[in-house]
């Protein structure tokens, strides 16, 4: 990874660790949970080789970026504020945006600041229009029960104890290799997930060690705080109820992705609802045999799918 440079940028009251490579039009990558800039290692090298400036920060609460202690510091407004400040510090006016659970924040970025986005490639997590009648957590509890993982992440200390009950490397092996497409309803926590006997070809012990070393140092609370701020973000986004995402968009999802199998999601994506809420949605790609972490699992295909879209602009 000798071509990847690392820096620390002051933005929005925090210090943000940023990995970047190349020069040219900027592509900003937003990682998911429980991940880091490192999840985009393949894309950074590929797009930088094609004449792009590829930028992948550790988001607030992750890796070598500051982690404010309060869950209320992890709303979409905070995260998008961090990213706008980052672009300002880097002297970048507009970016191509790419996200996974970063996808959640990428949708909000496009909702709040479409002027800063040339085009969007989002992976795994579809746009969810704000429902003014029910908060996200109440909706999840109603639909999937209290043992749904987002609900289990809410009480401070409980999820931390679950993730701390096995060594960090083992937890990453469990998490990154999940292939059960059913929504994670986990009465006994993520520690109850199966540990693979061997790693898949796309994931090395070195990769696991990188994630594990960072999270062993920081813990997982920063990541959990995104989930703990979901309802606060919902409250604060009331002015955007009914707003559309008006950015050219490509959406990519694996057919084994757990989010793709949430109740009603396939119907929303393929039945016209998604296109109504994202009117400049140009393409939906469903990748056969791929699960949630497709930017790592199917790196070459994802690289090509991203490039084929952004090169048009």
From Swiss-Prot:
GO molecular function: hydrolase activity
Pathway recorded for this protein: Secondary metabolite biosynthesis; terpenoid biosynthesis
Enzyme class of the recorded protein, top EC level: hydrolase
Site entry (Contributes to the formation of an oxyanion binding site for the epoxide oxygen of substrate), positions: 149, 227
Catalytic reactions on record: an epoxide + H2O = an ethanediol; (24S)-24,25-epoxycucurbitadienol + H2O = (24R)-24,25-dihydroxycucurbitadienol
Annotated ranges, domain AB hydrolase-1: 25-299
Record-annotated membrane-spanning stretches: none
Residues that bind an epoxide: 149
EC number: 3.3.2.10, 3.3.2.-
Annotated protein name in UniProt: Epoxide hydrolase 1
Species of provenance: Siraitia grosvenorii
Gene: EPH1
